Swiss-Prot record:
<keyword id="KW-0552">Olfaction</keyword>
<feature type="topological domain" description="Extracellular">
    <location>
        <begin position="1"/>
        <end position="25"/>
    </location>
</feature>
<dbReference type="GO" id="GO:0004930">
    <property type="term" value="F:G protein-coupled receptor activity"/>
</dbReference>
<keyword id="KW-1015">Disulfide bond</keyword>
<keyword id="KW-1133">Transmembrane helix</keyword>
<dbReference type="InterPro" id="IPR000276">
    <property type="entry name" value="GPCR_Rhodpsn"/>
</dbReference>
<feature type="disulfide bond">
    <location>
        <begin position="97"/>
        <end position="189"/>
    </location>
</feature>
<feature type="glycosylation site" description="N-linked (GlcNAc...) asparagine">
    <location>
        <position position="5"/>
    </location>
</feature>
<feature type="topological domain" description="Cytoplasmic">
    <location>
        <begin position="47"/>
        <end position="54"/>
    </location>
</feature>
<dbReference type="Pfam" id="PF13853">
    <property type="entry name" value="7tm_4"/>
</dbReference>
<keyword id="KW-0675">Receptor</keyword>
<keyword id="KW-0807">Transducer</keyword>
<feature type="topological domain" description="Cytoplasmic">
    <location>
        <begin position="218"/>
        <end position="237"/>
    </location>
</feature>
<feature type="topological domain" description="Cytoplasmic">
    <location>
        <begin position="121"/>
        <end position="139"/>
    </location>
</feature>
<feature type="transmembrane region" description="Helical; Name=6">
    <location>
        <begin position="238"/>
        <end position="258"/>
    </location>
</feature>
<feature type="transmembrane region" description="Helical; Name=1">
    <location>
        <begin position="26"/>
        <end position="46"/>
    </location>
</feature>
<dbReference type="GO" id="GO:0007186">
    <property type="term" value="P:G protein-coupled receptor signaling pathway"/>
</dbReference>
Amino acid sequence: MDPGNHSSVTESILAGLSEQPELQLRLFLLFLGICVVTVVGNLGMITLIGLSSHLHTPMYYFLSSLSFIDFCHSTVITPKMLVNFATEKNIISYPECMAQLYLFSIFAIAECHMLAAMAYDCYVAICSPLLYNVIMSYHHCFWLTVGVYILGILGSTIHTSFMLRLFLCKTNVINHYFCDLFPLLGLSCSSTYINELLVLVLSAFNILMPALTILASYIFIIASILRIHSTEGRSKAFSTCSSHILAVAVFFGSAAFMYLQPSSVSSMDQRKVSSVFYTTIVPMLNPLIYSLRNKDVKLAVKKILHQTAC
């Protein structure tokens, strides 16, 4: 289709989660609450780990990095969504849309690989405790984290670069609550075959590979837990692992539903619901899941509260 026969989209309207006016206030209050919990929880976790010397270990180094990613991941999307709920205008400019897509993709990809790094760290700690300090040295942790962000930036740059090559002119309504890949591809007047192929290939690498790493790590971890003779110790370990596995399953399951299938397979409304989980729910839950059953975190909180009171 010749781009010269069409006017390009310079400003778009985000369809949002619901078009019903009576739901906008309720959705605003719901997501405002989620946003506050997410920001407080993740920034609180980063601050707590930074201030507590006994938490300066590889496990908490990765947890701090995950909290930073979750904070950024959420704030790229939620503030704009809240403004749209409040004003009911839902307008986003083309540069703002591309910037949101680029930043969102960085942190979404980075989160996949950070969760895999954390699972590997847990595997080494439980299955090879004598070699833990050698394998998970500060040097290795640093470069693992750098690698996570490099993969995020590389994947996001590829997606956004190919998106910028498309001529968006079909409509100015984006059937989503933020600028994501498949909703934007639906606006294109030119062929999206390469873009959709890239989404499937890169999603397979950035979702399936980390998911398989996590699965393998937890298989070995569970096998080690089963060898624990103490019933109390075994149940405690299973309780902790089950909460971690649940958070990971929700994140990767919803992300896979969104990206690991062609755009024609499921409706955009189904994809909207799925994306709520990995863009807002999981970033809110992660600090709670990784801290509620953690004695080290509870001890650090008590110490800081005691120092503040004194």
